[in-house]
Every structure is written in C-alpha cells, then in structure tokens.
From Swiss-Prot:
It is found in: Cytoplasm. This is Cell division protein ZapB. The gene is zapB. The keyword Cell cycle applies. Belongs to the ZapB family. One of its GO terms (biological process) is division septum assembly.
C-alpha cells in the first residue's frame, strides 16, 4: 500500500514538473513576443514622430504658399 502511495505521489510530482516546464516555456515565448511587440511599438512611435514633423513642415510650406498667393492676388486686384 505504501508503494502505491509513493507511485501516486511520484506521478503527481512528475505532472507538476511537466506543468512547470510547460509554463516556463510559455513564459519564454511570451517574453519574446513582448519584446517583439515593444520593438514594434517603439518603431511606430518613431514613425509617428517623423510624420508629425513632416506634417508640421508641410503646414509651414502651405502657409508660405498661401501668403505668396494672397500677395499675388492683391497685386492683381490693384491692377
């Protein structure tokens, strides 16, 4: 009877070890995925900053062109 108890205990311990091993593997996979996603987020933030800067530059250029156009229209009105 004691032998059966030890066999059951051994089976439970082995099952616990297997579960822990699987969970550790899953944790490693999730860490890798997390790192990958963090890099993607960083890249997206960098892209966003670039686009914001480009947008600001284009807005400034648009303002310059609008001022030039207004100036030309004013000169045409004077003629």
């Amino acid at each position: 009877m004691a032998f059966e108890v030890f066999e059951k205990l051994e089976a439970k311990v082995q099952q616990a070890i297997d579960t822990i091993t699987l969970l550790q593997m899953e944790i490693e996979e999730l860490k890798e995925k997390n790192n990958s996603l963090s890099q993607e987020v960083q890249q997206a933030q960098n892209n966003r900053e670039s686009l914001v800067n480009e947008n600001e530059q284009l807005r400034q250029e648009q303002n310059v062109w609008q001022e030039r156009l207004r100036g030309l229209l004013s000169k045409m009105d004077e003629v």
